[in-house]
Every structure is written in structure tokens, then in C-alpha cells.
Amino acid sequence: MKSVQRHILFAATIALCLISCRHQAAPEPAEPQALSEYSEPSVPSKNSEPSTLSNPSNLSNPSNPSAPTSSPYAGGLEGVLASIPSSFVLLADVCPDIIQEIRYYTTYNFVGERIPGYERPVAYLTRQAADSLKLVCDDLKEQGYRLKVFDAYRPQMAVDFFVRWGSDLEDQRMKEYFYPDCPKSELFRRGYIAHKSGHTRGSTLDLTLFDMKTEREVDMGGTYDFLGETSHYNYSHGLTRDQINHRRILREAMMRHGFKPIAVEWWHFTLRNEPYPDHYFTFPIR
């Protein structure tokens, strides 16, 4: 009898334990771990030494120019816009007579490889800049010239790439052709390489004259994108009268129709009343 009572007592104890467990509150779920705050990439100060890159080919994949480029500056500029606004146009749609030789789509440039962001050899400009350039075309056609464009809108990703390339003092494969008289370590100080470019705002372009009679590019007394004094507009040492005159014809025609030049590059012009003076775009050229 006592044995039966012990078994009944044991069974009752087990039942009470089960009932108690069912009524216990489920533990509160753990608080999700907070995400760390996003911080903008830091831009090196003017006094800091640039980092040396051992292999510039790691910056981008030349066979796939749309591949993203790792850059300490990418996304760190105020006002960078990645989508193309409706006021940008293909230059060929507005000025079909213009010859386009987009150098940064090719390997014939001061870097020696296709530049990230240049996925097609075409030129984009803001509508305002393109319309003004059409007036320049009509003006010069009466003088027997066409325009030849080397670069127009330039994605910020390309500018970032130039900055990284400029910091790699070991890569000097194109020095003989584009900066033979300038140490690469001086390119930043002399203003040939910068963290920002007017091209990225969409109303700046690089161009030259094309002679309609000879069907040749006009001799300007210096090659496009040459990083040296011969590219300065007022450089005259060793230049012929025709070369100086050609520079003048291009500059005066551009200025008549609302473009402003710069002193250090005879080929570089920006629309005076550009629509995006404070924005730097980075959409790729497609």
C-alpha cells in the first residue's frame, strides 16, 4: 500500500512540474545589435604624403571599365550625384558635325589605360553647354573649321582614379609622351591632377580645331593632355605664327559664345553660366 502511495505521489509531482513549465513566460528576444554609424571616407590633407600603390592595374579592370574602382575619395565629395539628370544630352544629338575622339576611352592618354567610367566613346554635356557649342560650330564652319572633342563630361569615378594614379610614383609608363619635363611627384602641386574637375559638372570640354580643307587636325603647337608649359595658352617659345593663330581662333570663338578658358590648357573651356556649378556627377558614360 505504501508503495502505491509513493508512486501516486511521484506522478503528481511530475504533473505539477509540467504545468508550471508551461506557464512560465518565454524569454524576451535579445535586443538586436545596433549598426555602427556610417562615416565618410577621409580625404588626405594637402600636407600628407600620398600613399604609393604597388600595382596600378589593381585600381580597375581595363577589360571591364564599368568595374567599380576602390578609391579613398569615392562618395566622399559633397554634392556628388550618380544619376544622369534630364538636362544632360549626347553631344552628337545636338552637334552632329563635331568629331569625337574620346581619349579616356582609349589607352592613348597620360595614364596608359582606359579610364573607369568611360564605357562608350561618346560625349555628354549639359543641354546649355551643348546648345552654346552648336553656335561655336556654326561660327567656325564659316571659317573653314570643324570642332574635334577629346573629352566632355567626366565621371567623378574617373577623377578619383586619376588621383590614385597620381599617387603611384612607380607607374610612369606614359611619362615620355605626356609629362617628360615634369616629375610625377609634382603633378598635384602644379595643378595637373586634382580631387575635383570642372568636367564632372557637365559643362566643361576639351577640344581642338579640324581643318575642313585638309581634313586634318589643326597644328596647335602642342598635343592634347600634354602636362607641361607648351600647353599654356600664352606659351610662344618656338611656336610658329600659324600655331599661335590657331590657338587664338579657337579661344575667341569659344569665348564669343559663352565659354571661358583657362591659362594652362589651350584646349579646356567651361560654360560661364553652367547650370551645375556646385555638383559633381559620377554616372558612367554609356
Predicted regions and their residues:
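Compositionally biased, intrinsically disordered low-complexity segments enriched
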Residues: 30-67
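Bacterial N-terminal signal peptides
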Residues: 10-19
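Extracytoplasmic cell-surface/polysaccharide-interacting catalytic and binding patches
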Residues: 21-35, 65-152, 159-160, 164-264, ...
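Conserved metal-phosphate-binding beta-hairpin within the catalytic cores
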Residues: 269
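Bacterial N-terminal signal peptides that target proteins for export
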Residues: 1-9
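General helical secondary-structure elements
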Residues: 2-3, 18, 37
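Polybasic, lysine/arginine-rich low-complexity segments
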Residues: 2, 22, 46-49
